[in-house]
Amino acid sequence: TTIKEINVALKDLKNKKIRSPGAVHAKWLESFGASAETMDSPEMNEMLNRNTLDGAIQGATGMKTYKSLALINQDYHLPLGVIPFLLLINEKTWSRQPDDVKAAMLKRGGEVSAIYGGKAYEEAGQQIQQELKAEGRVKTTTPSAAQLMTYEPRNQAVQQWWADKTPNGKTLMVEIQAQLKSLRSSS
C-alpha cells in the first residue's frame, strides 16, 4: 500500500523508501531495488503523514487497526502472507492447568486455531477491501496470476535466504512446504 503512485510493475519500487514489517519482507523489497525501512505501524503512519515514506507493506486489517487508511490513495494488493501470531504459555503455568483445560487448549489451539484465525483474518481483509472500493478514494491494483508468477524467482530467493540464515531452516522449509501443500489440497 502506498501514498505515492506505483505503476503496475513492481520495478517502480526501485529507489523508493518502503516500510517493511520485518526482515523477510525487507529482503523481498530489496530484490526490487527498494530501500526497505523496518518500523512499527505508528512510526509508519508518522512517516506517511510527513511524506517521508513512499509506501508500506501492511495488511488491510493492520491499516484499519492503526488508522492508516486515511493516509493512502493507492493499494497494490499482493499475497505476501501474514505475520505469524503466537499465543504462548510458560511451562509452570501450563503444568498448573487442570487436565480438561489442557485438553481444550490442545483441541482448539495449534492447527485448528490457525485455520479459523486465518479464515477470519482473510474475511476481515476482504471486507476492508470492499469498503475501500465502495468509498472510491483508494485506487486498488491486483496483479494477474501471470504477473505474480514473474515475482516467483524473487520469492524463491528470499525463501532460500531465510532457510540458509535460520537454524534448521532447510528442514523447517521442507516441513512448511509440505504443510502448505496439504492445507491447499484440502481446501
Language-model segment annotations:
Residues T1-S187:
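N-terminal secretory/targeting leader peptides
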